[in-house]
Amino acid sequence: MRHIFWAGDSTVACNKFNTYPQTGIAQAFDRYTKEDVVIYNHAVNGRSTKSFIDESRLAVIYDEITKGDYLFIQFGHNDEKINDPTRYTKPHEDFIVNLGKFVNVARNKGAYPVFITSVERRLFDEKGNLKPSEHTEYVKGMKEAGEKFNVPVVDLFTMSRNFLEKTGDEASKKYYMNLVAGEADWAPEGKIDNSHLKYEGALLYAGMIAKGLSELDEPYRSLIIDNLALAKYLDIETNG
């Protein structure tokens, strides 16, 4: 069996019935992996690289991950929280340093690290145009870290932003946690949430990550089902 350890925030984390239909990307990812792949979802709501490390969550992964495993590293949303010193990191300074700590954990145990940029928030202006992103500098920081540490980067940010721009305001609403009254017992009056995902959104963006991995060299691409099967779930062009 091959094991994926996934470190991240609420866009990745496991959700249960009390927050349904919210779904983390990692919860939907096994639709795209081969049968011998097992996912261990260590993502936790509200965590940044800093708080994840400070709470010893990376240390837990270090104790469990072994040679030949994979470490998916997906942060950015909460590293932006400039008014919260327990979470905030500077995108081109300690954010990169922290990402290096994740890489060290993987490589010290003989595992393969992967950086995944943040999924874009669904924020449109009154004219129906997607607003400038709050994630940009952290995406750049993660790409810098990828070059510095020689780690592959799956650019979910760009893929998700392109999808939102193409799909538009109204049609993209169903992928995010925008609830009408009565749709969820825990939010009887409804909810507007353009950061977190319903199952449809988690499945979509998990597929984008799978597509990105399938385009990498080994040992990454062999995690993913073949291109024809992948295309069944994604509206993408494929050569075979």
Where in the sequence are the language-model features?
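Short, basic, glycine/proline-bearing loop/turn elements
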Residues: 9, 42-47, 87-88, 127
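Residues that cap or flank secondary-structure elements
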Residues: 17, 21, 53, 94, ...
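Glycine/Thr-rich phosphate-binding loops of Rossmann-like dinucleotide-binding domains
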Residues: 14, 49-50, 81, 124
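Short, exposed beta-strand "edge-strand" segments with a Pro/Gly-rich flavor and a Y/T-containing core
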Residues: 19-23, 44-47, 148-154, 191
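Short, histidine-centered active-site or binding-site loop motifs used for metal coordination
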Residues: 8-10, 46, 79, 119-120
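Serine-esterase "nucleophile elbow" of acetyl-processing enzymes
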Residues: 1-44, 59-67
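Structural motif
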Residues: 48-56
